[in-house]
Design a protein with these regions (language model features):
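Gly/Ala-rich beta-loop-alpha elbow adjacent to hydrolase catalytic centers
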Residues: 42-46, 50
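Catalytic histidine neighborhood in serine/cysteine hydrolases
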Residues: 154-170
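Conserved alpha/beta-hydrolase
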Residues: 1-11
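Hydrolase active-site cap/lid region
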Residues: 56-107
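Catalytic histidine-centered segment of alpha/beta-hydrolase-like enzymes
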Residues: 167-180
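Short beta-strand/loop motif that positions the catalytic acidic residue
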Residues: 126-127, 133-135, 139
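Conserved alpha/beta-hydrolase "acid-adjacent" motif
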Residues: 140-146, 172
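Alpha/beta-hydrolase active-site loop
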Residues: 16-33
Length: 191
């Protein structure tokens, strides 16, 4: 498990990070602590990071995305901001947004600008290994349509999506966790 800077138990501030930094962090950890083939497993933003790493690391042998959120800074955040929010973000460098899970969170100009340098749905995305996308039907943070768009965009011969009725963004019910465990084991066994 990896907590990106500004996430989980890491010591850095979220507002100091961006997609490029987090992808570089993940790549450095994978390079330092693994040998041989790797299966990338990423949830939400981690799904986007996994898409990026799948193009950078030749050792990737599979990808399991859970509510994967590719290009969310552009297609989810920026696209949903009204003119006043965009102006605040650009002028002040930060925009505070409410969260359904926690205290309000900051969206920085840095994350929006950097995200534009790492978009994966606007160029070919070859994945010549097993890909499994797990998605909840009740996810309001990453809508099922995002998973379908990613499914259709990935170029590969073994790309599948499972939509779980009633599952939300956290995808953490006992049934969801069992499905996740089974899916990772399946992808890891495919050669």
């Amino acid at each position: 498990r990896l907590d990106y800077s500004g996430h989980g138990r890491s010591s850095e501030a979220f507002t100091d990070g961006c997609i490029g930094d987090w992808a570089a962090d993940a790549q450095a950890v994978i390079t330092a602590v693994t040998d041989g083939s790797v299966v990338l497993v990423g949830s939400s933003m981690g799904g986007w990071i996994s898409c990026l790493l799948s193009q950078r690391l030749p050792r990737v042998a599979g990808f399991v995305g859970i509510a994967a959120a590719p290009d969310f800074t552009e297609d989810g955040m920026w696209a949903s901001f009204d003119d006043a929010q965009r102006k605040t973000l650009w002028d002040e460098g930060v925009l505070m947004l409410p969260s359904d899970y926690d205290a309000p969170y900051a969206v920085t100009r840095k994350i929006i600008e950097d995200g534009r340098n790492h978009l994966v749905l606007r160029a070919p995305l070859p994945m010549n290994f097993p890909v499994r996308l797990l998605q909840g039907s009740d996810d309001v943070d990453v809508l099922p349509q995002v998973a379908v768009a990613l499914l259709n965009h990935i170029e590969g011969g073994d790309v599948r999506m499972v939509l779980v009725k009633g599952a939300d963004h956290r995808f953490s019910s006992p049934d969801c966790l069992t499905l996740l465990e089974r899916t990772v084991a399946e992808v890891a066994q495919i050669k």
